[in-house]
A protein has these predicted regions:
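Conserved small/polar residues in nucleotide/adenosyl-binding loops
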Residues: 147-154
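Structural alpha/beta surface segment adjacent to cysteine/selenocysteine redox centers
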Residues: 20-124
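Extreme N-terminus of proteins, especially the signal/transit-peptide cleavage junction
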Residues: 1-2, 29
Length: 157
């Protein structure tokens, strides 16, 4: 068995692309078992707890809306190659990803980490949901089959 520790942030589009590429690579080695453990990494550890307006964030990070558009056009194109149809225009808030990482840690203990990570990426990058919002995280947890009580305990505490 090959054990993989992957450091990733739930608000990083390159991490989503990387996950898809890793899945393809693993599928080419059907005779090998892989154990993936997704480890937390925050791209923006100083992000306010409630996140910030997406456009303000992009301008502060890349210097201008035009620079951000150029970068995200490239990310969009790379995503399409991997079967991801990023919907960046639907993202209104760049969230603080801390609580999404807490949810992933619980998911690991329950053998659901891959499912939760997929749901986090899809919720944020495809649906524009604020994955820093405890209610969104709770919905994701319940959808992936946590009991409501356990999910509520993790997300709200």
């Amino acid at each position: 068995m090959i054990e993989l520790d992957i450091f990733s942030d739930t608000v990083c589009p390159w991490c989503y692309i990387g996950k898809k590429r890793l899945e393809k690579a693993i599928s080419n080695h059907k005779d090998t078992k892989f154990k993936q453990t997704w480890r937390p990494f925050q791209l923006n550890p100083g992000m306010p707890p409630d996140g910030m307006d997406r456009q303000e964030y992009l301008i502060s990070k890349f210097g201008s809306a035009d620079a951000a558009k150029t970068i995200y056009d490239n990310i969009y194109d790379e995503g399409l190659v991997e079967g991801i149809n990023f919907n960046f225009d639907s993202i209104m808030t760049t969230p603080n990803s801390f609580n999404s990482h807490r949810l992933l840690a619980l998911a690991y203990k329950q053998g659901l980490q891959e499912n939760v990570l997929d749901s986090l990426f899809e919720s944020y990058f495809l649906n524009g949901e604020d994955i820093g919002d405890p209610n969104v995280l709770l919905d994701i947890a319940i959808t992936v089959s946590y009991t409501h009580l356990r999910a509520h305990e993790t997300v709200m505490n």
